């Protein structure tokens, strides 16, 4: 397995589960959003404020292409990374893709106090999460080798599930 790539909505647990998977697999962990922040010296909300979502998505596309070209990485992506065709192609080519599925209710619970999510600065974050989920869910599924449920499951349980199911996948 070249890389293990985690996709899914905000609050699905991509970063938490990614760190645990990297430790288990003895691989390097990378978070595309954190890498963008390190490179720019600015946080994601600031980038959204200054460059808008299109500016951020340009940075994200370049970062995903770079990270997917590596070997031996567990990569956690931003929730909207799948919206661009080029990103989906890079993610699919970059390794095994695991879609961490979380219900909108679970997403609301996990993101309600997080001020670092510019797309949720709305009057109704739950409605925003629902709309994002409806637009993105088919795209996550399109590129996923595995779909793993994260609702009401401790991260370690999700990690064990992923590790077990990865072994059952045919080579590609």
Swiss-Prot record:
Positions annotated to bind substrate: 33, 57, 79, 136
Catalytic activity: shikimate + ATP = 3-phosphoshikimate + ADP + H(+)
Main location as per UniProt: cytoplasm
One biological process term in Gene Ontology: amino acid biosynthetic process
Name under which the protein is recorded: Shikimate kinase
Keyword Amino-acid biosynthesis: yes
Stored PANTHER family: SHIKIMATE KINASE, SHIKIMATE KINASE 1, CHLOROPLASTIC
Organism: Pseudomonas entomophila (strain L48)
EC number: 2.7.1.71
Gene symbol of the encoding locus: aroK
């Amino acid at each position: 397995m070249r890389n293990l790539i985690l996709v899914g909505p905000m609050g699905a647990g991509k970063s938490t589960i990614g760190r645990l998977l990297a430790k288990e697999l003895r691989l390097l962990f990378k978070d595309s959003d954190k890498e963008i922040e390190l490179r720019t010296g600015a946080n994601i909300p600031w980038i959204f404020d200054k460059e808008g979502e299109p500016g951020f998505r340009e940075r994200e596309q370049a970062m995903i292409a770079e990270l997917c070209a590596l070997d031996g990485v567990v990569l956690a992506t931003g929730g909207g990374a799948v919206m661009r065709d080029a990103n989906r192609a890079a993610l699919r080519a970059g390794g095994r893709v695991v879609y961490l599925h979380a219900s909108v209710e679970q997403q609301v619970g996990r993101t309600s106090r997080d001020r670092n999510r510019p797309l949720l600065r709305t009057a109704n974050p739950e409605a925003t999460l629902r709309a994002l989920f409806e637009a993105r869910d088919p795209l996550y599924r399109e590129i996923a080798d595995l779909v793993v449920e994260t609702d009401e499951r401790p991260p370690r349980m999700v990690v064990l599930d992923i590790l077990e199911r990865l072994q059952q996948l045919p080579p590609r």
